[in-house]
Amino acid sequence: MAATGVLPFIRGVDLSGNDFKGGNFPEHVKSMTSLRWLKLNRTGLCYLPEELASLQKLEHLSVSHNSLTTLHGELSSLPNLRAVVARANNLKNSGVPDDIFQLDDLSVLDLSHNQLTEIPRDLENSRNMLVLNLSHNSIDNIPNQLFINLTDLLYLDLSDNNLDSLPPQMRRLVHLQTLILNNNPLMHAQLRQLPVMVSLQTLHLRNTQRTQNNMPTSLEGLSNLTDVDLSCNDLTRVPECLYSLVNLKRLNLSSNQISELSLCIDQWTKLETLNLSRNQLTSLPSAICKLSKLKKLYVNSNKIDFDGLPSGVGKLSNLVEFMAANNNLELVPEGLCRCGKLKKLVLNKNRLVTLPEAIHFLTELEVLDVRENPNLVMPPKPVDRTAEWYNIDFSLQNQLRLAGASPATVAAAGGGNSPRDHMARKMRLRRCKDSAHDDQAKQVLKGMSDVAQEKNKSIEENGDLKYSDLKTKRWDKNLEKPQLDYSEFFLEDVGQIPGVSVWQIENFIPIQVDEAFHGKFYEADCYIILKTFLDENGALNWQIFYWIGQDATLDKKAGAAIHAVNLRNYLGAECRTIREEMGDESEEFTVVFDHEISYIEGGTASGFYTVEDTQYPTRLYRVYGKKNIRLESVPLKASSLDPQFVFLLDTGLEIYVWRGGNATLGGTTKARLFAEKINKNERKSKAEITTLMQNQEPPEFWEVLGGQPEEIKKHVPDDFTPIRPKLYKVGLGLGYLELPQINYKLSVEHKDKLKLDVVPELRLVQGLLDTKGVYILDCWSDVFIWIGRKSPRLVRAAALKLGQEVCGMLHRPKHAVVIRNLEGTECQVFKSKFKNWDDVLKVDYTRNAESVKQEAGLSGKVKKDVEQKDQMKADLTALFLPRQPAMPLTEAEQMMEEWNEDLDGMEGFVLEGKKFARLPEEEFGHFHTQDCYVFLCRYWVPVEYEDDKEKGKEKGEEGDDEEKQPEEDFQCVVYFWQGREASNMGWLTFTFSLQKKFESLFPGKLEVVRMTQQQENLKFLSHFKRKFIIHKGKRKLKVDSVQPSLYHIRTNGSALCTRTIQIATDSSNLNSEFCFILKVPFESTDNQGIVYTWVGRAADPDEAKLAEEIMNTMFDDTYSKQVINEGEEPENFFWVGIGSQKTYDEDAEYMKYARLFRCSNEKGYFAVSEKCSDFCQDDLADDDIMLLDNGKEVYMWVGTQTSQVEIKLSLKACQVYIQHMRSKDTENPRKLRLVRKGNEPHCFTRCFHAWSAFKTAPA
């Protein structure tokens, strides 16, 4: 394999993450004779493999995070070895060989996170050492001779050891740039060596027992020092030596005892990060405002108050992060809000009362943390001046126009809504007083008039204007070029730099060719060549050629010609596109490539479709995962099945989803959906998908798997964890290949910056794949090759060969295959390896009308049509309709009488247990919140008689007496009523029992109407003649008879909608405009209690009379009954029974204004609809926004399942409604209030009859 493969050309490979325990190291590594770097991190190695001896050109070796106990082996035989990284192993002193320090080129050594107790022997002989990392060991002493020869060191890390002192020879490290000594005692170190290290850039002395006495007196010579860390020490003030570091950029003084800062800090003019957290500071000096380059300032856990922050903090114009948590701040200076680049502001655990209003103008602010400030009141947000949200014009004029208002109304709404701009008026007055502007304007007018006079004079002298003055543009100049988007084919900087660019036509699309392959043309391909140069005037000019190969297909020829013209239009060039054919190139063309043109046999495939039968390989996959399923290929045999899992058998046009006996239903459903995606995206919906249960498989299923087994046994361990996929990026250079591995936990190659929650389990994301690259994804059981659309052809070819080598090199199952994926046509199994790879089209709902206008490149009427088509639809008509007027009492009584005249009979039933029992007539009109009722109503249907005169013409008078009159018809309506606290089992019981019986008794004449509490049919309510009573609990459930009960009588918009509902027994629920019934029971057999009908002083007299009748209906003579007016309540029974006297509402003005609107997107667009005046608490939809107008406030009620889009659109609709009502009802201006479900105030709940707790779903 190695002789004919690509292994000898590989210069670097990253095999980290593979399992090389127990001698599984691949032997083919010996064939990589050109290997320069090799990474074997996290591979489980216990010793260095022997194959390393064959890698004589190896320069960099990384074996971190393994179980190595020794580095003895062939390292000393590698003459070119430069770097050895063996961090996080089990190395001891004896495990580090002495002979590796005799290597002349060894310059990097990392032995950190091991078990060393002393410096490796002979380390001082490595004279060319540049980087030395011995941190996180147990070294307690550094020999004096170590740094005698290591004078070229650039990086030294000795942190997290047990060092007490430092050798004086460290002053020889004059080239050292980074020195890290964190977490060492260093109690005897005075750091006198520091001033000599003139090249030092980074100095970390965290937790090294630094005090004022053991710091150097001066560091003036360290002009390059930019990063200093002195945190977790015992400093009481800033060391004086730090003030001389004029180039300091990062300074960490956190976790010390510093109580004040000197004014000398203004010398740190280049400081970008300052950390003073966890000290004893009470204030910051004003000199800190002179640090104009400061980007990050941390002062957490100090004692700073408002006076401790300088007012000039706004001068820190580059400040990005400011953290002052756990201090004593009551306010923050308004100048802080002038730091326009501020992105993170943390002020939690303070004593904040409010924040400056300018906080809302920090447009780049991403994090504002003000938690644990109990008295904080956020300043109001400024009014948004933009009328258009989500491409919807929410201006009052536009919405009135859409609602069909008259032009006068629309104009009035616009005229009365524009507030005076006093600032603009001042500016106008100032401009009027400024005579300089007037003089300038007069000069401009005089100049224009002089030019016009000279032109007229020349016409009079010379007659008509010359022809050249009236010369028109050429016909082709007047043509309007279409606004086409070429950015998908050509980059932005194309043609902007002198040079040559070449594109190859592939699948109708131009793909840019690397500069190394310029002048090399495939005989079956076509190319576009652009030469950019500067003309004699220094302006950019271009030459555009398109080259045709002798064996090129028609689609490539056409594509080259078309895209050459597209390139000319994209550049705005005026040159011609020149056709060049293979073997007949012009001299002008060959000069572009210095007469060095070569032809290569072959070419890419044609872009035209070829009709051939697709061959699908048969694969068997095991499905695992909970939230997002993933597939792992397993051997194609019946023994691979396991009853714990779901398996997917893909035979091409037959896809089987097999569910094991112990597999979950959710996993089966997701596997079925996955199969549907395969069918739709890869099989053109031609495959048949079959779901199979264990022990119910058809014979053809077992034929594919080689026969049915005797028993399907569990063989996958319970702690099964899939092998982590490894993503490689193929690199190609001049004569070599590289295969680096992408660490997608720490990768910075994403198109968007990754957040921590994006890859919580080291998951791959689609953003890692670059369209210009080629990648290999090694999933152990499968190897995928992903080819980007703009990747070079040679890299593609090398990746295909390299994928085969990788597949055969490492130990993997026999059924593993290499699968090729082109960008945009990836298979579903490949996509499942990535997190949230979804091909759903992204829609931007935040576009406004201006952005829509900019997108349309049309003009005139066509442009307007495009804008109207792109605008999002919204219906706010309901907000501008008048409130539904209350129905007069006489009209309601007449309607009630008519409906009752048609009623022939009514039978009632109530659900008792699991059956419906007949309801006694004396209980008609009494309902309970936990019960379900059924009422069978029989109505007479009027019959239309024929005209007597027409009858007389057809029949004689004698026949009229004998003629039979037609029988009157009837109709049956079944009303099903369900209480708020009743379960849906009542409806199911009715559907399968009583309804079937009624349908058999009245075939074709039965209508079923389902109703819930307080959402009843008006016709149904009319049968109870305003005596509709709703009790709490169940009908036959014996409640505590000693507890008083209170009933509220209320009419909503019509006398038909009158209900008497039991509410909480609390005097705060009383209202002077309503009537209430209070039952106070006694513990006596003779007298069961006393019942009061309480009549408010402003109650309607008709309702007061009705309340007395309802009281007599509800209670028999065993109760004492009494009608009392407000203010005449007896103390003994009434106030004691109702639970003491409390304040209550004395008016119900809200009943005259109350309106409830629903804002929803359920129609596919944003629409507002109004509920009828008889609304109730259950009309509050949890997934929508509700607007409640009570005449003074407009409440915006937000449910728990409401989308953010609905919230934002509803807010704008609410503002439009308030603006409209301000002009319609000037005496009652509304205020906007926000209410979240479960936190409704009393002014909101009183608009609903009998408000109580929300219904909850059964557990």
Swiss-Prot record:
One Pfam entry name: LRR_8
Key words of the record: Actin-binding, Activator, Cell junction, Cytoplasm, Cytoskeleton, Leucine-rich repeat, Nucleus, Repeat, Transcription, Transcription regulation
Major subcellular location class: nucleus
Function: Is a regulator of actin polymerization, required for proper myofibril organization and the assembly of cardiomyocyte cell adhesion complexes. Is a regulator of the length of sarcomeric thin filaments. Regulates cytoskeletal rearrangements involved in cytokinesis and cell migration, by inhibiting Rac1-dependent paxillin phosphorylation. May play a role as coactivator in transcriptional activation by hormone-activated nuclear receptors (NR) and acts in cooperation with NCOA2 and CARM1. Involved in estrogen hormone signaling.
CDD domains (UniProt xref): gelsolin_like, gelsolin_S1_like, gelsolin_S3_like, gelsolin_S5_like, gelsolin_S6_like
Chain ranges passing through the membrane: none
Presence of keyword Nucleotide-binding: no
Positions of Gelsolin-like repeats: 509-589, 628-702, 757-830, 1170-1225
Organism from which the protein derives: Danio rerio (Zebrafish)
GO cellular component, one term: cytoplasm
The keyword Repeat appears for this protein: yes
Compartments where located: Nucleus; Cytoplasm, Cytoskeleton; Cytoplasm, Cytoskeleton, Microtubule organizing center, Centrosome; Cell junction, Focal adhesion
GO biological process, one term: barbed-end actin filament capping
Protein's UniProt name: Protein flightless-1 homolog
Gene name, Swiss-Prot/TrEMBL: flii
LRR repeats: 7-32, 33-55, 56-78, 80-103, 104-126, 128-149, 150-173, 176-201, 222-245, 247-268, 269-291, 293-316, 317-339, 340-363, 365-385
GO MF, any single term: actin filament binding
Lineage: Eukaryota, Metazoa, Chordata, Craniata, Vertebrata
PROSITE patterns named among the record's database cross-references: LRR (PS51450)
